[in-house]
A protein has these predicted regions:
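Charged, amphipathic alpha-helical coiled-coil/dimerization segments
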Residues: 25, 77-135
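N-terminal leader segment of winged-helix/HTH proteins
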Residues: 1-35, 82, 134
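Short amphipathic alpha-helical/adjacent loop interface patches that line ligand
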Residues: 21, 65, 109, 120, ...
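C-terminal regulatory/oligomerization modules of transcriptional regulators
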Residues: 1-6, 130-155
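Pre-recognition alpha-helix immediately N-terminal to the DNA-recognition helix
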Residues: 12, 16, 43-47, 107
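Charged/polar positions within long, soluble alpha-helices
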Residues: 29, 110-117, 145-148, 152
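N-terminal helix-turn-helix DNA-binding core of bacterial DNA-binding proteins
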Residues: 22-68, 155
Length: 155
């Protein structure tokens, strides 16, 4: 007879993580879509809005979003086509190109954020008692710092 896997079994742990992630994305995705954004675009706009000068070097945006350089180029191409960001070359070092949030991008983000914030509040924050949420957030930061320390710019 096969023994039931324990809660600490690596496959069980990852299964729970994947199921939770997929479920949360399914609940949050309509808030992005209602504003003409994908989750990745929403993430990029938030990162730009919280950065000094509302801009990031393309390489830094790639690092923070976990995208390759070609992936972030495609992302910024889409955002630029929609008037949400512009590319700017650093006059002091022409090798650096920045993605900069436009007024239209800031406005779109401002329109999407209340609904997004409410969905995160409902589907994530309110699902746990405060002490468990605090423990989860601490654990997520430990894991994030171990796995992607370069992604810490906006937390």
């Amino acid at each position: 007879m096969t023994e039931a896997p324990s809660d600490r079994d690596p496959i069980t742990v990852m299964g729970l993580l994947f199921e939770t992630h997929e479920g949360l994305i399914a609940k949050l995705e309509p808030t992005w879509r209602d504003h003409g954004l994908s989750g990745l675009e929403m993430n990029a706009l938030q990162r730009l809005s919280r950065s000094p000068g509302r801009r990031l070097r393309m390489v830094d945006l790639a690092t923070q979003t976990g995208l390759s350089t070609s992936g972030v180029t495609r992302l910024v191409d889409r955002l630029q086509r929609n008037g949400l960001v512009v590319r700017e070359t650093d006059p002091a070092d022409r090798r650096n190109t920045y993605a900069t949030l436009t007024q239209e991008g800031d406005a779109r983000l401002g329109q999407a954020l209340p609904e997004y914030r409410a969905a995160v509040q409902h589907w994530f924050i309110e699902q746990l008692p405060p002490d468990q949420l605090d423990s989860l957030l601490a654990a997520l930061r430990i894991l994030r710092d171990a796995l992607r320390p370069e992604a810490t710019a906006i937390t």
